[in-house]
Amino acid sequence: MNSNVENIYQLEGRVPVSKAIPFGLQHILAMFVANIAPIIIVAGACGLSSGGMAMLIQSAMIIAGIGTIIQLYPVWRLGSGLPIVMGISFTFVSIFCYIGPTYGYEAIIGAVLIGGLAEGVLGLLAKYWTKLITPVVAASVVTAIGFSLLSVGAASFGGGSGSADFGSAKNLILGGITLACCIGFNIFAKSFWKQLSVLFGLVAGYVVAVAMGMVDFSTLSDASVIALPKLMPFKPVFHPGAIVSVFLIFLVSATETIGDTSALASSGLGRDVKAKETAGSIACDGFISSLSAVFGCLPITSFSQNVGLVAMTKVVNRFTLLMGAIIMILAGLFPIFGTLLATLPDAVLGGCTIMMFGTIVVSGIQMISRCGYSQRNISIVALSLSVGIGFTQVPEIFSIFPQIIQNVFAENCVAVVFLVAIVCNLILPKDMESKNEKAD
């Protein structure tokens, strides 16, 4: 097959490797920080050592590469065949930051193992249930996810919850400098370079942290140069409350995957997504997340920022993204890389992510706008967000319920919003506007 650089705008076809690598690398750089940030946040909340965090970062890069390859080139019914980039999901961060300190990191692994298998099966059966999750339900959930992550970003900005110097001047200054670098790069950078604003902020913030003496390099001396990821580094614990709550978030993740897959087909290929592509995308999400748990890592999902990059550049060639996925896997084979990233101060991460989390809120609001402000949609969004966010601010309100219900819902606003939105969507009449007009 002849290689042609013009094939970068075609799904099929070979592109010269010298051209494919930089375009593929661009996709990896666009999602790099978002891929490792959930690991650093959750590992910190669970009290894992820097060595354990480095191991998880290594696994995250390898799993993200594997997941991306399967999305590009489906295996059986797993994968969409579309240029979808996979990475560690932010959707689960808030619930993991509750499960980890409460039941241990092993309970997270057990819940991901079961939840991923369940989502994978649901993906294979997608045509029977996806109609339940309408755009307004997905929009409500995405908005709730953004709100739930704001406190996580703020905690990192202050130096990490529980740290001895939390909220100190040096942490706030470091977080502020990092945030300013992200914003400045986003303002002055041109074209697709804007997609790398978070990466620029991370590098700039890290350099400043080194200059301020806030980085501990002692762990680098023990890091191997090359190593394979470990199988089952954490023995899974299957806690019922953790499994149920994580399964609910897997359903939320599935709705995001549906949206990303549809958006990519529309913006990148100029057509509607096929049912087979949606089902394969969700199945890949679930089963590869379970594989991720086998390596002690967190769930993966499709990355919206890469969907945005496709929409902007129109680079949809699968071979080009394959080059990026291979680079990601190779990077994961060098533990020194993960160990270096594990030395990243919390304040730098907070400066990078605080605006990113706010962007998720805005994305949810934009999704609500696209659904339209009908009386029915307003009722679904208003009730689900007010109950979900409001009730979980006073978790004692759930005290009359069984412990498993409290474990799942009392401090998990995303799960509550998802449940209330689904129920409202099922019971509210489709013709609320016409009924109101007749009443008038």
Where are these regions (language model features)?
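Helix-boundary and loop/linker segments of multi-pass membrane transporters
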Residues: Y9-P16, M232-G241, K274-A275, S374, ...
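Membrane-embedded alpha-helical modules
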Residues: I99-T219, M323-A325, I329-E437
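Short, non-helical or kinked segments that cap or interrupt transmembrane helices
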Residues: M55-L56, R77-F90, K131-S140, K194-L199, ...
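Intrinsically disordered, low-complexity non-transmembrane regions of multi-pass membrane transporters
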Residues: M1-F23, F217-L231, S266, G270-V273, ...
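Short juxtamembrane and helix-loop transition motifs at transmembrane-helix boundaries
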Residues: R14-F23, V42-G52, T68-L78, Y98-A107, ...
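Hydrophobic, membrane-embedded alpha-helices of multi-pass small-molecule transporters
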Residues: S18-A30, G167-L179, L196-S197, M212, ...
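Membrane-embedded helical hairpins/re-entrant loop segments and their flanking transmembrane helices
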Residues: V17, A43-G79, F247-R318, K438-A439
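N-terminal signal-anchor module of multipass membrane proteins
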Residues: M1-I84, T91-I99
